[in-house]
């Protein structure tokens, strides 16, 4: 035997303990030839086999436990009498602690004491002291009683809460202030909860709206991508689309001006545009968009202007038009009055000069817009009518004075003045008749009866160096009775016959 094994056996005999059943399975004892089987006198119903091996051996000991007898005395947890003594000594010390722990674990929740529970507690203690009920049974009974008392208290509390609610709904003289304050606090809490729910719902709606806008944007982008893939214009060669970036770089205003000022016929522009219609479909700017942008710009500019800017501009324009027309007429009258002899001698030259003056004034008039030209024509027609009426009144007054005084020089000067004023109103037919043209023999001039009689009283005709006949011109004013001048019978005199309007 090994010394280590001898030492273990001696200790086991002294302590009367089998270490092979309590220690680990592995042992350091050497292997014996016959193998040792230990069967303790204090076997507990199991056959214990323990094979010891040396430290040098490779075989480990293995414990085999096989039940042999099943009796209450041979129970594996039951120990020897000495062992029971030791165990009871240790258990006697640890039992109160264990019971206290069990009591703390089994004890229910602490509830406020009521008169019923206080009456139950002394009876429990009395039963414990007098009748000798074990501790475990008393703890179970106390827990059951505590649960029953808790249920009764919960019922009482619910009934009290119902009564308090009834008291709040139907106020009486003896209402408790604490109950009112409690109900007030509960109402405030309910209102706060409602507000919180409303705020949460608002936040949720905002979040949903943001999600909706984001998804709508994504949908729009997807539609654009699909349209790009399906649009055949994007699959055309680059040569057909080379002009589009240049067209995009041109400012919008210049494009609209070029579109408005284009004078090419539509038949020429259509074939050119038909080839590029598909390519410009997605990139070109439609005229409706241009008009809308112009209207927006005009509205913004008009809103920026003051309220008095338009009336002042209109008055200034009206003043300029009247001033221009009056200056033109005054300069024309001055030029005609500066050279009366030339105008009287050569009426054709007067027509040529008037035509040249019209040609010189035409470019200025052509530069005006159609609206300005129509306004100027209407204004000038009104001014000319007023002027003609004023001159007619002045002329009649002058003629009345001359007939009363019978002064030939004054009458002649008056006739010359009338000739100057009426030279710019001579028609082409009248000029042709004065020049002796054959095509104007059938033309006739109408004069009033009173003026015809005044002409007969004075010197009615003048002759020039070449012997041709010239007639003095008078402006025609408002009258009901008219007369015409007949064709000349000879070179020296002319026959003048007065007729009524009915004869004509």
Curated annotation (Swiss-Prot):
The gene is TDA11. Residues 179-231 form a coiled coil. Residues 32-62, 252-306, 332-377, 400-504 are annotated as: Disordered. The modification Phosphothreonine is found at residue 236. Residues 470-479 have a biased composition (Basic residues). It comes from the Eukaryota. It is found in: Cytoplasm. Its main location: cytoplasm. Residues 257-287, 332-359, 368-377, 491-504 have a biased composition (Polar residues). Pfam families: TDA11. This is Topoisomerase I damage affected protein 11. Belongs to the TDA11 family. GO terms for cellular component: cytoplasm. The keyword Phosphoprotein applies. The modification Phosphoserine is found at residues 244, 286. Keywords: Coiled coil, Cytoplasm, Phosphoprotein. Residues 290-301, 403-421 have a biased composition (Basic and acidic residues).
